[in-house]
UniProtKB/Swiss-Prot annotation:
This is Formate--tetrahydrofolate ligase. It comes from Pelagibacter ubique (strain HTCC1062). Its EC number is 6.3.4.3. SUPFAM superfamilies: P-loop containing nucleoside triphosphate hydrolases (SSF52540). Keywords: ATP-binding, Ligase, Nucleotide-binding, One-carbon metabolism. Pathway: One-carbon metabolism; tetrahydrofolate interconversion. GO terms for molecular function: ATP binding; formate-tetrahydrofolate ligase activity. One of its GO terms (biological process) is tetrahydrofolate interconversion. The lineage of its organism: Bacteria, Pseudomonadati, Pseudomonadota, Alphaproteobacteria, Candidatus Pelagibacterales. It is an enzyme of class 6 (ligase). It comes from the Bacteria. Pfam families: FTHFS. InterPro entries: Formate_THF_ligase, Formate_THF_ligase_CS, P-loop_NTPase. It catalyses: (6S)-5,6,7,8-tetrahydrofolate + formate + ATP = (6R)-10-formyltetrahydrofolate + ADP + phosphate. Belongs to the formate--tetrahydrofolate ligase family.
Length: 561
């Protein structure tokens, strides 16, 4: 048996084409007015060029989501890349639009996030590390606002900011639990007024959300100005624009907001831009990137983070609501290993055939299919094939999908690239072409905020009730009174269960949704509802991926998979 190559080995063997050749495939002219090269294999598309595309018709939008995942993930990015390559193989002009990886999980639990096997975007090492510096710009803009807040207080606090009611934390793009709650301005009067503060991870930042939901620079600046940063001693809101912060923050983001273009291993175009997490944020790449893809190709394949209860719900109820995007089809990625886990199999036994456990775990897939159909969208299932999957297990999964009225396609893109997704690609194209445009939101914008939360909890998570104390309910009422009642809901919870208890696998019922905290994102224009024990600053696992990452004697990176 031949040695199985690692993702990084495969990526290094890629025969990448110059980025201007990749852009030529989607008719972007080889002119400085259209794009700015960032080396030989990456470019940023200029906003002025994007303005010239406004009158072009849109292509078909395909959303890739997944069943409730294992900690290793079920391969949404890999499947998105593979499906994009498959669509191009069957003669469809397609672009994949992905999120940028965060350094947190790259050095933490999951490792890199540029696909896997023969379904990757490249140059993989650059994409997984600093890429084009977008996350640095977002982090810098966010922390500039933090610095301006404390500076304003130091120089007299003309706005009468109550230091006990500052709601704007600092951020960094790393998993570091020690920074969740800190004291700042210590060391004497020269350093300011001591107060409590903390850090979130950059991908949970409201700046990241605004960056990904803005339509252009003007919209970006307006939204930044509308960020609620604190409250006065009279409990009146203080906004970023009160500190004149929107101008310099937009300056820091003016280049980052241009979409990044790179390529797949099969030299098909990929747009990689923005990267909020889906468990603690809205989990979708930028609106600008998605709209760019729709103007340049007949099909755009994009993914939303974690399971369909998180990323897909937020993509449909937040991103689509804010941008007038409408998917033509949704692909749910399922793996045999995750379904066996939902059927009660222990992690160490997932590689052993167990058809009965698989059948028991299929309730998880069934619920995700039912949930997506509530949005009026056609569904396809992509079975992301692993080497240890058996014929009996695959057969049981595909036959089950037939009984619930969806077609499942066995996908071998990890081993075979686009050739391994041609069946899925053909089915997706068929669903897109006959889409009857029945897309609808789960709730109306005018629905009261608490009712919106209840709707998501009961319709998507299948909870019996939402638990919220008087303080939470009063906060929601105050948001409505302040004019934010039309905002959609962004629920932050564990990605490992429909419930807030990560140990409840399968399709649990009879549980409740306890609200721990709510946050107003007045710039991003949604309400964050934090449930259970989920953290907006993750920690590293006992054995982080960083333990295996190093430079070898040839100066090459090892361990970044």
């Amino acid at each position: 048996m031949s040695e199985v190559k690692s993702d990084i080995q495969i990526a290094r063997e890629a025969k990448m084409q110059p980025i201007n050749d990749i852009l030529a495939k989607i008719n972007v002219p080889d002119e400085s007015s259209a794009f700015s090269p960032m080396g030989r294999h990456i470019a940023k598309i200029n906003l002025e060029y994007l303005d010239t595309l406004k009158d072009k018709p849109n292509g078909k939008l395909v959303l890739v989501t997944a069943i409730t995942p294992t900690p290793a993930g079920e391969g949404k990015t890999t499947t998105s890349v593979g499906l994009n390559d498959g669509l191009n193989k069957i003669g469809k002009k397609s672009i994949v639009c992905l999120r940028e990886p965060s350094l947190g999980p790259s050095f933490g639990m999951k490792g890199g996030a540029a696909g896997g096997g023969y379904a990757q975007v490249v140059p993989m090492e650059q994409i997984n590390l600093h890429f084009t510096g977008d996350f640095h710009a977002i982090t810098s803009a966010h922390n500039l606002l933090s610095a301006l807040i404390d500076n304003h207080i130091y120089w007299g606090n003309k706005l009468d900011i109550d230091v006990r009611r500052i709601v704007w934390k600092r951020v960094m793009d790393m998993n570091d639990r020690s920074l969740r709650s800190i004291n700042i301005n210590l060391g004497g009067v020269a350093n300011g007024f001591p107060r409590e503060d903390g850090f979130d991870i950059t991908v949970a930042s409201e700046i990241m959300a605004i960056f990904c939901l803005s339509n252009d620079l003007e919209d970006l600046e307006k939204r930044i100005g509308n960020i609620t940063i604190a409250y006065t001693r009279d409990k009146k809101p203080v906004y970023a624009k009160d500190l004149k912060a929107q101008g310099p923050m937009t300056v820091l983001l003016k280049d980052a907001i241009r979409p990044n273009v790179t390529q797949t291993l099969e030299n098909n175009p990929a747009i990689i831009h923005g990267g909020p997490f889906a468990n603690i944020a809205h989990g979708c790449n930028s609106v600008i990137a998605t709209k760019t893809g729709l103007k340049l190709a007949d099909y755009v394949v994009t993914e939303a983070g974690f399971g369909a209860d998180l990323g897909a719900e937020k993509f449909l109820d937040i991103k689509c609501r804010k941008s007038d995007l409408k998917p033509s089809c949704v692909v749910i990625v399922a793996t045999i290993r995750a379904l066996k886990m939902h059927g009660g199999v222990a992690k160490d036994d997932l590689k052993t055939e167990n058809v009965e456990a698989l059948k028991k775990g299929l309730v998880n897939l069934q619920r995700h299919v039912e949930n997506v159909k509530k949005f009026g969208l056609p569904v396809a299932v992509a079975v992301n094939h692993f080497i240890k999957d058996t014929e009996n297990e695959v057969k049981a999964l595909i036959e089950f999908c037939d009984t619930i009225g969806v077609k499942a396609s066995l996908c071998t893109h990890w081993a075979n690239g686009g050739e391994g997704t041609k069946e899925l690609a053909s089915h997706v194209a068929e669903l897109c072409e006959k889409n009857e445009d029945k897309f609808k939101f789960l709730y109306e914008s005018k629905t009261p905020l608490f009712k919106k939360i209840e709707t998501i909890a009961k319709e998507i998570y299948r909870a019996d009730e939402v638990i919220a104390d008087t303080k939470i309910r009063d906060q929601l009422k105050s948001f409505e009174d302040a004019g934010y009642g039309d905002f959609p809901i962004c629920i932050a919870k564990t990605q490992y269960s429909f419930s807030t208890d990560p140990s409840l696998k399968g399709a649990p019922t009879g549980h409740s949704l306890p609200i721990r905290e709510i946050k107003l994102s007045s710039g991003a224009e949604f309400i964050v509802v934090i449930c259970g024990a989920v953290m907006t600053m993750p920690g590293l696992p006992r054995v982080p991926a960083a333990d295996s990452i190093k430079l070898n004697k040839d100066g090459e990176i090892e361990g970044l998979f």
